[in-house]
Design a protein with these regions (language model features):
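Alpha-helical scaffold segments in carbohydrate-active enzymes
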Residues: 102-105, 225-236, 261-264, 268, ...
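Cys/His-rich Zn2+-binding cysteine-cluster or related metal-binding knuckle/ribbon modules and their
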Residues: 1-12
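Intrinsically disordered or highly flexible coil/loop and linker segments, enriched in small
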Residues: 53-54, 73-74, 81, 152, ...
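Active-site-proximal binding-pocket segments
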Residues: 136, 197-200, 204, 210-213, ...
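Structured secondary-structure scaffolds
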Residues: 3, 17-239, 281-285
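A glycine-rich phosphate-binding loop feature that marks nucleotide/adenosyl-phosphate handling sites
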Residues: 1-3, 162-164, 213, 248-253, ...
Length: 395
């Protein structure tokens, strides 16, 4: 298969086409050197069994096990029909097969077997290789076998993520069925697009992209839930206390559920992140955001604000809202870094208050911090109008 630069036997083809990309294949015959990958079949299976998390997600591991058990073929490592590339040192008629060259770069770029770089001992073995599912075979069969042959340690984990599909098929520049990410980022902001991609699709699986799903996710999660919570919280602090909460506060048993969720959020978030379950990690954050919005309805701060004797209680309610934002703000910063910074500015939190360590503690910011209202971070958009705009080829 020319686009994939892969060699296949007739038995490996799927309906006579490339099993990876579905494209046409061509019969080819040329002199080549081979790496005896088949020698490592049993050793690879044993390694998978002893290191069950080596290939992620688990469905990908099952695919690789099945591939080996049907008969692992030796790997062609040189070409004579291609002139560009690195020459085989002992036979200049041959150039090194591009994937052998590419895979070896993981260690040679760190200094393995050369005097140019000196970071091999520091950085190898890698904690994780993050690759597309279409090149998983190279990273979990050929590459580990090469490392075994060199008596070198394997990377700790290889994660093969799925494709983002459009109209049921893989996006392809050659087919013209692609979504312009620059256009989306210019229109909605890179944070919103990044959030959608990681929240909408379980990482590692296939996911369908539609303009409607993008806009609905932005409107529901970012504009309605997070954006509205930020706007309401800061505006009430400004309205009732001039932007600065007093030190005197009055807690109530109805605060306990929300405070408990805020305090336990970081541990739940970390658990999902460690498993590369980014969708679940963000879901945990937005559970707290949703509960905080419900807490506003339960405590009715607008009613408390009308009674001077309940100012301390009002201060406590608003403080809990700001605490929720302070804790929920930095956790999604790997997905939405500018948004985390903007939230910090509006709720009057310092860099230390918004550090990654701070979500593990409740009651961090001082009472005297000043909050100020800013422009909507995620403006709500009209679904029909936005879809028409996105589907307009001249827009």
């Amino acid at each position: 298969c020319k686009p994939c630069e892969s060699w296949w036997t007739e038995a490996q083809l799927k309906d006579g086409k490339c099993p990876d990309c579905g494209g046409p294949v061509y019969e080819a015959e040329e002199e080549a050197y081979f790496f005896k990958t088949s020698k490592y079949a049993d050793r690879l299976l044993k390694y998978y069994d002893e290191h069950p998390d080596f290939i992620q997600p688990a469905t990908r591991k099952n695919e690789m096990i099945a591939f080996i058990k049907q008969g692992l073929q030796d790997t062609c490592v040189s070409r004579t029909s291609v002139s560009w590339g690195i020459q085989v040192p002992f036979d200049p008629k041959h150039t090194i097969y591009v994937w052998i060259d590419a895979l070896s770069n993981y260690i040679t770029a760190l200094g393995y077997d050369n005097d140019t770089y000196h970071d091999f001992d520091k950085y190898w073995p890698a904690d994780i290789h993050m690759v597309g599912k279409e090149i998983l075979r190279f990273h979990t069969l050929i590459w580990p076998a090469m490392l075994m042959a060199l008596d070198l340690p394997l990377p700790t984990k290889v994660f093969g993520h799925g494709w983002l599909l459009l109209n049921g098929g893989k996006m392809s520049k050659s087919k013209g069925n692609v979504v312009d990410p620059v256009k989306l980022c210019d229109r909605y902001g890179v944070d919103a697009v990044r959030y959608f991609l990681l929240r909408e699709v379980p990482f590692g699986n296939e996911g369908a992209f539609t303009n409607e799903a993008l806009i609905n996710r932005i409107n529901t999660d970012l504009a309605n839930d997070l954006g509205n919570l930020l706007s309401r919280s800061v505006s009430m602090v400004e309205k009732y206390f001039g932007g600065t909460l007093p030190a005197e506060r009055e807690a109530d048993p109805m605060d306990e559920e929300l405070v408990g969720m805020i305090s336990s959020l970081r541990a739940k978030y970390e658990e999902q992140m460690e498993q590369y379950a980014f969708q679940n990690a963000l879901t945990e954050v937005f559970k707290v955001i949703s509960r905080t919005n419900k807490y506003i309805d339960e405590t009715a701060p607008w009613a408390l604000g009308k009674d001077e004797s309940k100012k301390a209680r009002l201060a406590s309610v608003l403080y809990n809202l700001l605490e929720s934002l302070r804790v929920c703000g930095p956790l999604p910063s790997p997905f939405m870094p500018p948004s985390a910074e903007k939230i910090a500015e509006q709720i009057g939190a310092s860099k230390e208050d918004m550090s990654y360590e701070s979500p593990g503690r409740h009651g961090v910011p001082p009472a005297g911090a000043t909050r100020h209202q800013g422009p909507p971070r995620f403006p709500r958009t009209a679904l029909t109008k936005e879809i028409a705009q996105l589907e307009d080829p001249h827009a």
